[in-house]
Amino acid sequence: WDPLEEIIIGTADYANIPIPNISVMKCQFPEYEEEYVRKHTGFYPQQIIDEQNEDLDILSETLGKLGVVVHRPNTQYANSPCYSPNWNGKNWHYHCPRDLTLIIGNKIIETPSPIWNRQFETWAYREVFSKLYEEGYDWIKAPIPILHDENYKEDTRGVPALNNEEILFEAANCVRVNEDILYQVSNTGNEKGGQWLQRTLGSNYKVHITEDLYSYAHLDSTIVPVKEGLVVYNASRVTLENEPEMFKSWDKIWIEECANIENAPFGLPWGASEWIGMNFLSVNSQLAIVDKKQAMPIKFKNGKR
């Protein structure tokens, strides 16, 4: 709950839709046919990339004016192939530094994504991590997964896509609240990943594994802690029956819907979640940066209408 001091803001440079493979189809596009995805592979339209970079630059400048140290990714390898003895692909994007990096106490943890195309994504942040390591942080990388086909369920409709074969999860499957970490089993994290995280962190932290909130991917459009004692819930996914025990005594803000956005511009077949408006960035316990179109969360300034 301390004020934000340092952050990595991503970039839209080289953002693309990857050529379909089992990991992309099972974890990212389970509702689409492979041939449909294949028709739309390649870089996003340049206008989307330029407009998003403009927004990210403004966000970076805003945070800098608030006294936050801002880092940006090194895109040297962004347009490069990535491969292992078991698979090959191409690096995806550097939109989301949060997705694959956990900062817990003085530990930097690079997490093992189940998606082929994300295995080298954290290379973009190595300079930042190296600096923090020199300052005394512990720097941990989870075991590099083989990502054989047995990791992915045959039928993923409405259920998490991953079997419990390897340690697989993304950092954005987690929400940390003091010494408690809520861990979501989904298309981007299996139970074994939560077990590994608990063993790695030891007895100073408690990892709470949940499977009944949202099976698609990350937690940050489902549950967002604002400050100690106040949490935002996605009302379409969280109920009083399935809410995590760690939040039962907290005040709740229930978001019934987000403002409409142009979900799939330029004729693209998909876009952001309809709940993307729940993504906001807390600078301190009294200040959050919110999409200006999202009147619903803005109404609840300081937890009140």
Name the predicted role of every residue range.
Residues 1-305:
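The feature marks the mature, well-folded catalytic cores of soluble enzymes
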